[in-house]
């Protein structure tokens, strides 16, 4: 595991080497070394989308999240995990949340949970409209570039991935799918 915190990348570091310590530059890693990935795998059940959510974290995003969990203590950690699997409006039902891998020595942190997303389904005139986008993104707030006095800095360089898949039931057909954003 070769994680290097972003805040020291590109800095000089002294490496012990007996009587002659070495000064070297800490290498900068690519932005994709830090990943925040949330995926949903749904199927239609009654009037709701039901399925599994899978959250993966690597690099600075993993370190940030693990610090957040550690600061919260054991009492609130399950609630934090469930909130991170939920949509921004927290209107989905999240159950059976559990860690798959939270070992700090491993590259990825991973937790999963069961999801019931009833607000994603709207039915009218025998047709079903499905909203797959949970709008779950930590850093998607609008940046006002007209009123700012300083440069805008994101907290860390990272790739944020949000993916949702839906298994279409037998006998159903897709009538319209909006273009990709």
Residue spans for each PLM region:
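A sensor for short, sequence-defined functional sites
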Residues: 1-181
């Amino acid at each position: 595991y070769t994680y290097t915190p972003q805040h020291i990348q590109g800095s000089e570091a002294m490496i012990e080497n007996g009587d002659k310590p070495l000064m070297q530059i800490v290498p900068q890693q690519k932005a994709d070394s830090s990943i925040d990935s949330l995926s949903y795998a749904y199927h239609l059940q009654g009037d709701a989308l039901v399925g599994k959510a899978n959250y993966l974290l690597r690099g600075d995003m993993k370190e940030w999240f693990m610090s957040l969990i550690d600061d919260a203590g054991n009492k609130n950690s399950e609630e934090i995990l469930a909130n991170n699997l939920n949509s921004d409006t927290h209107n989905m039902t999240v159950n059976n949340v559990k860690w798959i891998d939270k070992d700090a020595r491993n590259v990825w942190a991973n937790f999963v949970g069961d999801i019931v997303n009833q607000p994603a389904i709207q039915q009218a005139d025998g047709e079903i409209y499905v909203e797959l986008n949970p709008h779950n993104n930590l850093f998607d707030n609008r940046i006002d570039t007209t009123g700012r006095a300083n440069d805008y800095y994101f907290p860390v360089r990272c790739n944020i991935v949000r993916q949702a898949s839906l298994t279409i039931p037998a006998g159903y057909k897709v009538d319209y799918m909006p273009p990709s954003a």
